[in-house]
Amino acid sequence: MAAVNAHRRLRGPYTFGGALLRVLVTEALERSPGLADRYDIEIDAVLPGMRERAPGRRRPIDATLPEDERILVPAPRRTLRLANGIAELALAVMPEGVSLVADNVHEADPTDLELLQVLSRRLPGVTVVMVEASSAPADVIASDGTTGDPEAWAAYEALDPAVRKELHDRRAAELGWEEMLGALPWHLERGSDPAAAVEALWAAVDRCVGEGFLHAVVDLGQRGLALSEAGSPDWWRFAQRTATALGGLGRRSEALVVYDQARRTSLDPAVHASSAYGTAMLDARHPDPAQRDLGRATAWINEAIAISTILPDPRERAFKLGFDQNGKALIELRQGRLDAALDLVESAIALADELPDGAHPLHRMVLHANRAQLLATLGHPKEALHDLDRAIAYDPAVPDHYLDRGNLRLRLGHTDAALADYETAIAVSPPLPEAYYNRGELRLGQGDLEGAKADFDHVIDLDPGFLNAYVNRAGILEMLDDHEAARADVVAGLALDPRNPHLHAVLGQLETAQGDHAAAMAAFDVALEGAPGLASIWANRGILRYESGDPTGAVADLTRSLELDENAAVYFNRAVAHRALGREETAREDLRRACDLDPDDPDIRHALGS
């Protein structure tokens, strides 16, 4: 495969990824048409012009809805799923020994940089080369502004402005859908028709929002703002999407600037309501609880609700008021007021029922999913399941709702149904680490160590930063006596979270097995500092204390473990410690209780007999 110019100015997000995917899809179609269909979501997102060749089977409903009903913005991690899907197609069709060369990577969109990292990690037989040098033509117009040749740029700047505009217009007329996120708006911005540029920028923003290309939304949105009259409807469309993307990327102060600018330039009540809502969510959704000012968030969301309540159009009022009430429900939830949160969501559902039949299905879907979470937390799992069923019915292509329903079914003991939900989530989504992780936990709970380990292996392949996968895999490896691999996972996990109590608990077991009692004790101490309510850590430290010649300390730790969770093995171990202290009758009491809990254990029966 020839070197690919990865400059985002060519085709925007996935400039490199689109070129690669075109080759992969062509190869997949030659081998087996069904193979390409398995990656329909990735093809739709990265190379939509090929969807007719690989029509696929998974189609979310948002593509069929009008603009004002497409309310969902994918999380930033969606692009990691897409990158892994492309990598898995490459694994299926790309021969070993191939080199992939991307140049102009210093100007690549973050989606391509992420993809290149995933390909480097997941394709061991393929060489991925990234360079900053440019293979673009040494002409500004012909290269779509990607050339790095200073002489070409000097010649371009020396052109008569009218000639420059005409050249940009001509080049824009030659471009099509492949360049709609990159070269097309770039040329139109510099051509003679500003209205066409605004239209092209909006089309690009709208598509990038739907796909979750948030960095591109910010770039394109800011360019659209610069070409639009402040306070105009076009300006607000760009402003709202730009601020939303900035918030999703964690750039909250920049998002706040956009919302403040909207408040200063608009007299439209709906704009003020939406700006107040967006400002409230910057606090309510902050990933660090310590950084959330929920009082300030409440003030802003109350303003949004107050304005939405008096909007004159009944349909707009029913939607926006319900939308704002759902936002306030999140703030109430963050403050532990679950009943108040539930009341707000139910009020929003009642408002949605006032909308015309079929209107705003995504809004209704979100409301039922949110009510399900609240009902489950409040101890109403059957009602929660009903709401999740309704959410899934609105759009069966949303994987997160299958995960939520699977978790709830597992909690209710419906293991087979939970497994089916996890596997459906896997089927309807690009590679989804959370779905494999949840299935791995289910398999671990069933005692299927090899199956669970395979799932956790895949989670770490998909996302090397998935901490809990290291925790669980390390525990499995320790149980399988693969101490070297378990220690490697502990080290990798502690690099992500140096004080993680679960990893220190596994480390304590590994050090105990190696005979380093001092290191084991230190590890268990750290684990208990972080998770004092975890019975297994107290039990393992109790065993260590007994083996270190401290039966009194062992009894204390084992007693604390039993206070947290009755367990036959822990009663047995405490009986052994009591016997070492000469407390025969107390030991026998523990053995009898152990036998009650596990009457078939031969070690317990033998100890009672002796």
Give the residues covered by each predicted segment.
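Short coil/turn connectors between adjacent alpha-helices in alpha-solenoid helical repeat scaffolds
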Residues: W153-L159, A204-H215, T244-E254, D283-T298, ...
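Flexible helix-coil transition and linker loops at the boundaries of alpha-helical arrays
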Residues: L188-G191, A226-W235, R264-H272, I305-F319, ...
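Short secondary-structure boundary elements
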Residues: R81, S135-D219, G224-L227
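Sensor-1/coupling segment of RecA-like P-loop NTPase cores
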Residues: G97-A102, E107-S143
